[in-house]
Amino acid sequence: MAYQVLVICVVSSIVFAYIVWRKERKKKLPPSPKGLPIIGHLHLVSPIPHQDFYKLSLRHGPIMQLFLGSVPCVVASTAEAAKEFLKTHEINFSNRPGQNVAVQFLTYVFGPYGPSVKFIKKLCMSELLGGRMLDQFLPVRQQETKKFIKRVLQKGIAGEAVDFGGEFMRLSNNIISRMTMNQTSSEDEKQAEEMRMLVADVAELMGTFNVSDFIWFLKPFDLQGFNKRIRKTRIRFDAVLDRIIKQREEERRNNKEIGGTRQFKDILDVLLDIGEDDSSEIKLTKENIKAFIMDIFVAGTDTSAATMEWAMAELINNPCVLEKARQEIDAVVGNSRIIEESDIVNLPYLQAIVRETLRIHPGGPLIVRESSKSVVVCGYEIPAKTRLFVNVWAIGRDPNHWENPFEFRPERFFENGQSQLDVRGQHYHFIPFGSGRRSCPGTSLALQIVHVNLAIMIQCFQWKFDNGNNKVDMEEKSGITLPRAHPIICVPVPRLNPFPVM
């Protein structure tokens, strides 16, 4: 019986694909490589899709069509193509595809564009991640940075190796934890580790290829155990955040009973205030609040940590760049104190290093959207419900905009007007944080974390490797962000003597 059902499904899929093919061939569609029945072009795409899309675009052009199973897709691989989709036709491509993970966790980052997403974006820019809130949390970032330095320094004195990625992830997670829920991971290491693992699992699920998302007749079957993993992760997610929110609600009730107020409001307090405000533009439920907290952890922790790790990898492999950055920091800051956020504005070469890192290793290598209706883009007909991939990774390697694009050379940002390039999506050949109404609302926070902590690694330490050649591997692995395939592990050697008192 099961065999007969499978045969019927396969035959139906072939017939359906043929009908669609006959219908679509009459339209002027983007160029496309040859596909196969049922799977379309899935065989051409690996777990690191941005690399495969880039190679295919060299043959088929800046706008190409793919069928990932039964899902029609279009890939934009140049700045000009990206501008057409993200600016000229922005409204039509404001939705994001409703994948199973996004549905289960009700995320705003990966959900469809609508009133709730608009409200949260406005709230982020004005309140949650705006300038006033970032200024309020400056002492938090400073405290966590000092703890980070002390951990690395202690390992250096003991001659122990440091895992860059692990330390950067812990730092980012601690900052986000305290900004969001005013909790320090050192105060409750068990809960902090639970949260770190939960964030890592959700990020992995969001970046994992699930065949049932792409081949329609497999949707009822959980062939990879993917749905089971989502359900188990969701249970853990609910348990952790329900406990945190319940505890905070009790604290707020107790404060009201004694006539007091919380002098220091974190992001959770702001969200709960809105949830209790009957006049609010959008009524936030507890599920909405949990979804936003998960978004800020996944988006804020992973990307900042990965960017710092890639930057250190590039500096280690380019010692002349590292030395030039060190000289700039020594000239501006000196050796008697540790660099602070207020120093960054006076360190243009450091800023160029971060920009160059984001060009080659963008935190989100693909911008994923979905068309809400049929539209003509650059003369090509793009049907409704077509999944859009803007290949940010490929755009950063386009020789039409970047001279010697595979070379790590921060000096390029002082040449040919490139110093005016902004990371916030106004220049489409440099969009590491996306562009338009669905760009990353946490850009300012991410840049603050990355700049100052990268500068501290340059100023305070030199690095000793066991591999003998002082070079690190630059291989990527699959993920929703851009993780490294191999960790950077080396022994920190304190550079400042005496080391400044913290």
From Swiss-Prot:
Annotated localization: Membrane
Binding-site residues, heme: 440
Leading EC class: oxidoreductase
The keyword Oxidoreductase appears for this protein: yes
InterPro entries linked: Cyt_P450 (IPR001128), Cyt_P450_CS (IPR017972), Cyt_P450_E_grp-I (IPR002401), Cyt_P450_sf (IPR036396)
Source taxon at top rank: Eukaryota
Needed cofactors: heme
Induction behaviour: By methyl jasmonate (meJA).
UniProt xrefs under Gene3D superfamilies: Cytochrome P450
Family: Belongs to the cytochrome P450 family.
Official protein name in the record: Cytochrome P450 93A2
Originating organism: Glycine max
